[in-house]
């Protein structure tokens, strides 16, 4: 005869597993909307120290520097910005990849930069990481602290120009 206590324990174990899975997805989705769909992106900083402070506040996020070069631009200007990446599995952009146009457009929209839609697919995109633990999981060149600071400063100047248009 089956042990009734064992049956109850198995049932509770299954309920706990289902509950933990549901909780994981709930918080994952909530974190996504808070971090990625927030109208004020977490990733626009004036220094790496500010990045580190924000990372302490949002430990689940990995900060990535995206560097976009648009050949359609007369000056071939680089636009550099920091954006929070929820997981390291977030799709990264690769060089000359038209099928990522929609994703690139989505990211650019989130930081309120306005570009001609048809030119985005021609952009050469390179991904640089600020933090070594992110770099180790991506096949991308790593920024030094000085390079990252320069990138952030350059982005802030560039963003200021675009916002004034």
Curated annotation (Swiss-Prot):
UniProt main location, coarse: host cell
Transmembrane segments: 16-36
Keywords from the UniProt entry: Host membrane, Late protein, Membrane, Transmembrane, Transmembrane helix
Topology within the bilayer: Single-pass membrane protein
GO cellular component terms given for this protein: host cell membrane; membrane
Disulfides per UniProt: none
Inducing stimuli: Expressed in the late phase of the viral replicative cycle.
Localisation: Host membrane
Annotated family: Belongs to the asfivirus F165R family.
Protein name from the UniProt record: Uncharacterized protein F165R
